[in-house]
Every structure is written in C-alpha cells, then in structure tokens.
C-alpha cells in the first residue's frame, strides 16, 4: 500500500459524510496520488492498526445465526473492495482503483481511489433502490458474496443507479476456490488452461515464470509506461507490467477470457488493470483510448497479422507462433513497419514443441 503524507488536514462536510468515511475531492492531493481523471478519495475515519488485510470497514451488523442467537458481522475492507469491483464490472458500483494510506499526525488512514459519481441525493425512489440491490444480489449469487443487511433505508448509498456502501458485504468462505474454478473454465486455449497463476497454485499450458526468464523482460523498463496486451489470456503479463511499475495497463481478449482475467486480478489486488472483452478483426485499426508505450503481442500473429494499431506503440514485445522462421518474421515486420528496428531475445518457451523466439521491435 502506498503511503502519502498530508500537509494539512482534509476538509469535509459533516452532513454529507458517512459514519465511517467521507469523500475528498482535494485536487492537490489527487494530483499527487494519481494521474486518473474523474476520481475522488473515499477516506476512512478509523486509523489503520496492523495490516491492511485485517482492516474492517464500518461497524458490526447484528444478524441472526442458524441457532437464532444474534452475531455481529462486518466486512474486511479488501473483501468489500473485491465485491465492489465485481459489481462495478457489471455497472452496479463505482470502481475502486487502489487502496492508499494517508499519513497525518503519526497515524495512517486508509483511503480508496474510486470513480467520482458526484453528490449523493436523498431523493432516490425506494423501488429504484430495491431494483439495484436485487441486481447486486444476483451478482453475488453468481460469484459468491452476500449481505444480510441491505441498508435500503439510506437513499444516499445509491448514486446514478449505482450502490456505493459495501461495508455489510462479505465473500463466501469458498470464494477463492470458486475463482480458481471459473478461471480454469474460462481462461483456456483449446482444452487447456493457458496461463499459470502462481499465486493461486494454478498451472497451465505455458509456464509463464519460466517464459519471463527466457524472454529477459527484466531488461526492459516498464516504469511509468502505458501497456497494452493483445490476447491477454489470464492477465499474467498485465500483472507483471504493473509489478514492474507500469502506470496504465489494458488487457484485451474474448469476453469470457477477459472476465476470468479481471476476476483473478481483482482478487489478487490489481484493482487498476483494465480488461476489455472484444473480438478483434484482422487488418482493422483500433483506438484503445490512450497513448501506448508497450504492446505485448505474444502468439497472436496467426490471428491478426501485423495489425495497423501496432504502429501506435513505441515498443512491441512480439512472439511468433512458431509457424514461420524467425528470419521471415523479422523480414515481414521490417517490410510492414520500416521505421522500426528489432532486437532478438533468444530462448525456448516451455510448453511448446518448437523454438519460439521473442523479439523486441522498438521505434528508432
């Protein structure tokens, strides 16, 4: 978690804040923390004690247990963020991009960088609140989260047809297992799980940790770069780019695959990686909405050729499919993109029966 020192206390409206958090739109602080537009900070009143993984959002809610004895429940902040982003993926909540810490007078206060929906209103109709909550509960049934306290009485928790207060939501005990199961079912190539997810013990057709070593990507600088991964599969290289300091990352694949990549990344805490489910057509140009520094173009040439949008990148990390000799791949790329020069990085990619050499094409 990144920590930022406050130079002065944040100002908030007592009448517009919640019991446990408030919204800050302090532009000086936001510009210090993020380059994203259209976001605000949701700052929590209770300081952090111990690990952020153990930080709870809000107060305990009394709910009935199976033996009719009441018990208290409240959500861990990181679980609530996972749930909120699952709802955001379906258009039912503002998206959380990062959990940061704000340091003031020796204490650290957790805060969320989140989509700014504007001011809340007390005029949201009851039927509309019920409609939104029912949609969220269906999403919970699909993924594996729940609430026993819907809090429909607070109209201000519903802004622009989205719900903003997930302090009473919890993940089901088997959620991790369900994430793994869904990933294996969706992030596939042929009949195989394609990319490994070491953090979850998921193996795959391509040993990505070994591939990183062979591709020698550690020699490249990702700091502050915007990265596009075409055919991102399970999002392994998207997460790698973020770990290496990339400022913005977008992974593109078929919708079902993008769903799996998003859920795994969200569960692992990579909240700010964007995923897009779309079917790219060969020889068509696409505007991905941002200036691209680096494109991962791994084993997708046979589907798209040298797509026109590759020209927009400053660097292309390219792996051919093994169906053409390396020299032919370089020759064809040089013909299509004469303003580029190439550096070959040698090595055999595991999981393949051929030598697939990864090439770096970089603009002069």
PLM regions: where:
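Conserved beta-strand signature within the Rossmann-like core of class I S-adenosyl-L-methionine
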Residues: 313-325
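Conserved structural core of kinase catalytic domains
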Residues: 97-132
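Catalytic activation segment of kinase domains across protein kinase-like and atypical kinase folds
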Residues: 150-182
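ATP-binding glycine-rich phosphate-binding loop
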Residues: 3-35, 43-45
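Conserved kinase catalytic-core helix
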Residues: 83-91, 120-162
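Conserved alpha-helix/loop element of class I SAM-dependent methyltransferases that forms part
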Residues: 205-222
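ATP-binding glycine-rich loop module of kinase domains
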Residues: 29-77
């Amino acid at each position: 978690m990144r920590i930022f020192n406050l130079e002065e206390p944040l100002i908030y409206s007592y009448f517009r804040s919640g019991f446990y958090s408030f919204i800050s739109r302090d532009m000086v602080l936001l510009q210090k923390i993020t380059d994203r537009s259209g976001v605000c900070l949701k700052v929590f009143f209770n300081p952090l004690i111990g690990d952020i993984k153990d930080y709870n959002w809000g107060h305990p809610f009394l709910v009935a247990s199976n033996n009719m004895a009441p018990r208290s429940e409240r959500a861990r902040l990181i679980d609530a963020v996972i749930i909120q982003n699952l709802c955001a993926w379906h258009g039912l909540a503002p998206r959380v991009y990062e959990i940061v810490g704000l340091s003031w007078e020796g204490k650290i206060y957790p805060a969320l960088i989140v989509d700014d929906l504007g001011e809340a209103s007390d005029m949201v109709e009851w039927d509309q609140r019920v409609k939104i909550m029912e949609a969220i509960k269906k999403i919970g049934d699909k993924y594996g989260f729940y609430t026993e306290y819907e809090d429909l009485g607070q109209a201000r928790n519903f802004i622009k047809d989205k719900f903003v207060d997930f302090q009473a939501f919890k993940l089901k005990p088997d959620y991790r297992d369900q994430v793994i199961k869904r990933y294996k079912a969706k992030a596939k190539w042929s009949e195989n799980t394609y990319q490994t997810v070491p953090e979850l013990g998921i193996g795959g057709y391509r040993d990505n940790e070994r591939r990183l070593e062979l591709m020698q990507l550690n020699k490249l600088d990702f700091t502050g770069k915007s990265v596009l991964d075409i055919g991102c599969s399970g999002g392994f290289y998207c997460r790698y780019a973020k770990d290496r300091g990339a400022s913005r990352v977008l992974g593109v694949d078929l919708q079902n695959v993008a769903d799996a990549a998003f859920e795994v990344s969200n569960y692992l805490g990579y909240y700010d990686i964007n995923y897009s489910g779309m079917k790219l057509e060969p020889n068509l140009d696409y505007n991905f909405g941002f200036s691209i520094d680096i494109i991962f173009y791994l084993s997708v040439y046979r589907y798209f050729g040298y797509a026109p949008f590759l020209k927009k990148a400053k660097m292309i990390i390219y792996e051919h499919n093994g169906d053409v000799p390396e020299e032919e791949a370089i020759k064809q790329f040089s013909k299509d993109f004469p303003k580029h020069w190439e550096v070959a990085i040698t090595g055999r990619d595991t999981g393949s029966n051929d030598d697939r050499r990864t090439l770096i094409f970089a603009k002069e």
